Amino acid sequence: MINNQTLARPYAKAAFEYASAANGSDAWSGMLGLAAAVVEAPEVAELLRNPRLTRESKVEAVLRLFADDVDEAFRNFIANLGEHDRLFVLPTVREQFEAYKAEAEKTIDVELETAYELSAEQLETLAAALSKRLDRSVNPRQVVNPALIGGLVIRAGDLVVDGSVRGKLSQLAESLKS
């Protein structure tokens, strides 16, 4: 069976290309966020799974919830998704759209898991170093986890760098078991 990532990809790509050409990627990002939130609502998700409703009635119901907050092109996009019975992939379309947007803008979200709260200066220094290393503008988000004991774990996309004391102790324990 085909997964949501595969189903969403052509829609996300088309949406991103359209939004980029129209200089509206931020607006489309917001509209996709709104639409994704709507279809993720339990009541709407149940409605979309109802086999007795036609595709057109599902589109009408979904659009009724946010039609005033989106432009005509976006309403057409939603209608196209509905016509192909793909409204349920909107959250995945949004995720992929954001990935395309981040790639185009050369930005990346980075999670910094630390044992204690970093100062603004430390966070800024770390973000600058990561920005240089990753060749992207970094959007750091700090997560405090005292279980790390010290150091930090950096997560940026597929990259994970564990420089924590807990990580080093785990590596040492593994090497001693060998």
Swiss-Prot record:
It is a peripheral membrane protein. It comes from the Bacteria. It holds the Pfam family OSCP. The keyword Cell inner membrane applies. One of its GO terms (cellular component) is proton-transporting ATP synthase complex. Keywords: ATP synthesis, Cell inner membrane, Cell membrane, CF(1), Hydrogen ion transport, Ion transport, Membrane, Transport. It is found in: Cell inner membrane. One of its GO terms (molecular function) is proton-transporting ATP synthase activity, rotational mechanism. Its main location: membrane. The keyword Cell inner membrane applies. HAMAP family: ATP_synth_delta_bact. F(1)F(0) ATP synthase produces ATP from ADP in the presence of a proton or sodium gradient. F-type ATPases consist of two structural domains, F(1) containing the extramembraneous catalytic core and F(0) containing the membrane proton channel, linked together by a central stalk and a peripheral stalk. During catalysis, ATP synthesis in the catalytic domain of F(1) is coupled via a rotary mechanism of the central stalk subunits to proton translocation. Belongs to the ATPase delta chain family. F-type ATPases have 2 components, F(1) - the catalytic core - and F(0) - the membrane proton channel. F(1) has five subunits: alpha(3), beta(3), gamma(1), delta(1), epsilon(1). F(0) has three main subunits: a(1), b(2) and c(10-14). The alpha and beta chains form an alternating ring which encloses part of the gamma chain. F(1) is attached to F(0) by a central stalk formed by the gamma and epsilon chains, while a peripheral stalk is formed by the delta and b chains. This is ATP synthase subunit delta.
